[in-house]
């Protein structure tokens, strides 16, 4: 049985990856420091003999006994509401955490995939964004701690591939949504649904003309799986190329929820990207991948998940660190 280490295993994406690799017949070792992850996302796996969980901070030395075939490095705060509160930890997990995982991959002769992000493109001046675009990032802006952590992650991953021969993959993840997101993580979809569930007006920043491209989590996980199983070592965008303005997205959520609340507008945060849409030509040509779940279907699944949560979850305040 092949063995895989997944860091950030109790997070939104990490927990779905644990499910996928258990389903594929792997022995999964999950690792998470639980700063932003939630143990409830993986507790259904605890009874399984092919799943182990370690409560550990990957920015510190990592030891895993026995062989490892793959490492997926997904540990990191991913929401602005989190990384603006814990900027140094965000930088450390992107730098030290990646370094530690790469060292382990070198030792175990494992293939390693790192979770990069569309944020490496910053506030892009090229649209849509392909993998050859270098980006437009403010390294000292409030979002810079996340953007630059991920850019460094890509650089050190390429360096380990070039100079140490580590077999590596880099996925650039665009906006993703689905069950197990935190309602209070501040990102657009859970924020809109949470406000609708509580009977509050939906908050749109700026005039709402800024665009995003939302990919349902199952599609994303399939793309990551295909990339890992390929032999391609340069970055690959995985995301949904169907772009929508945040104002129109808020209107879709209102229609879905049947809520009678209104939309209110607030000032746009500093360095908030004005547009975001992946060019997925590389994923289509190399991996035969493209998203298959349309937004209406994915939104319905996600809304039903959030609505099924205990009502005290609907009004939970963002986590304090």
Question: Predicted regions: what is each one?
Answer:
Residues 37-39, 122-123, 180, 246, ...:
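A short beta-to-alpha transition loop/helix N-cap that caps and shapes the active-site region
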Residues 152, 156-160, 192, 249, ...:
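Hydrophobic alpha-helix immediately C-terminal to the catalytic Tyr-X-X-X-Lys motif of short-chain
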Residues 85-86, 180-184:
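Short, solvent-exposed loop/turn segments at secondary-structure boundaries
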Residues 145, 153, 185, 246, ...:
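Conserved donor sugar-nucleotide recognition element shared by glycan-biosynthetic enzymes
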Residues 75-78, 90, 181, 209-215, ...:
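Glycosyltransferase donor-binding loop in the core domain
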């Amino acid at each position: 049985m092949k063995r895989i280490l997944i860091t950030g295993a109790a997070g939104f994406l990490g927990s779905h990856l644990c499910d996928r690799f258990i389903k594929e017949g792997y022995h999964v070792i999950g690792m998470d420091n639980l700063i932003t992850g939630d143990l409830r996302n993986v507790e259904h796996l605890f009874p399984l003999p092919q799943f182990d969980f370690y409560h550990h901070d990957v920015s510190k030395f990592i030891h895993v006994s026995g062989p490892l075939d793959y490492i997926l490095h997904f540990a990191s705060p991913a929401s602005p509401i989190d990384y603006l509160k814990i900027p140094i930890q965000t930088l450390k997990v992107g730098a030290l955490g990646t370094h530690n995982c790469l060292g382990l991959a070198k030792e175990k002769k494992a293939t390693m995939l790192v979770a990069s992000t569309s944020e490496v493109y910053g506030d892009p001046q090229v649209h849509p964004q392909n993998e050859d675009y270098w980006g437009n990032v403010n390294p000292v802006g409030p979002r810079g701690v996340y953007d630059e952590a991920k850019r460094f992650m890509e650089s050190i991953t390429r360096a380990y591939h070039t100079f140490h021969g580590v077999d590596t993959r880099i996925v650039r993840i665009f906006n993703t949504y689905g069950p197990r997101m935190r309602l209070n993580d501040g990102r657009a979809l859970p924020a809109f649904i949470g406000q609708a569930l509580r009977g509050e007006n939906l908050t749109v920043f700026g005039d709402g003309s800024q665009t995003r491209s939302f990919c349902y989590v199952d599609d994303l996980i399939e793309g990551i799986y295909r990339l890992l199983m390929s032999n391609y070592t340069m970055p690959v965008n995985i995301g949904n190329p169907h772009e929508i303005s945040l104002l129109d997205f808020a209107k879709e959520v209102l229609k879905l929820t049947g809520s009678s609340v209104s939309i209110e507008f607030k000032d746009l945060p500093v360095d908030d990207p004005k547009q975001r849409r992946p060019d997925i030509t590389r994923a289509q040509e190399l991996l035969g991948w493209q998203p298959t779940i349309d937004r209406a279907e994915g939104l319905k699944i996600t809304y039903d998940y959030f609505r099924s949560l205990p009502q005290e979850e609907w009004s939970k305040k963002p986590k304090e660190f």
